[in-house]
Amino acid sequence: MSRSMGLILLLAALPGAPVDIVATPSFLTALVPFASYEPPPIYLDAQQGRFYVTEPDPSLPPEAAARQRRGHCRHSIAAMVAHETYPGHHLQLVTAQELGSEVRRHLWTPVMVEGWALYCEQLMAETGYYTTPEQRLFQLVNLLWRAIRVVLDVGLHTRGMTAREAVDYMVEHLPIERRSAEAEVRRYCAWPTYQLCYAVGRRDLLSLREDYRAAAGDGFELRRFHDALLGYGGLPVSLARWGMGLEERP
């Protein structure tokens, strides 16, 4: 995590709150097979984010435990840390809590928040954060995963796809074992339309960055763009675009 913090100093202002790495609570492991993030409560003086990491289940039989451990590949850690902590969720959500606007502190949309975190996985590839071909490969696997979530989100909630079919699709197209895929699909079923927001948000943010770059010309600075974007908290990307003067008000 310290490597990503060092790089992000060149890309955005760092918030003051630290983040703890803790084991995922047992009541969440059925929905979170790998990792997740919980921001600090807004009105507490002690601002501490939590990066939850789901550990392999020690109660599984040896063969099942080995399959689960294969899903917890060390080469995926770099992109996961970038997504959940710096420059991803922790940086964005804690920065939002420090804003003066109550609306920007409290309201957020998954297209902005999850789009930002997935954008950050790619951003760290652009900065050279991934030091091995395997780390870069898993960043691209994550990108494929989010594209597959679009297919499954739409399929499960509007096309009659069953949970079993969704699990089969994941196992066929991704390096994921069945138990973890089942946990993922349970979450997809519980949160309609949320899962497609990762890919849609990343697409919208990349488009916004290019339009901002074109408007700034030779004066474009990546950190200035990120600081301006983070100043909108988790508001919709369309509102950030309008606020930056790149489009008529939605």
Where do the PLM segments sit?
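Long, His/Glu/Asp-enriched segments that create or flank divalent metal/ion-associated functional microenvironments
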Residues: 1-250
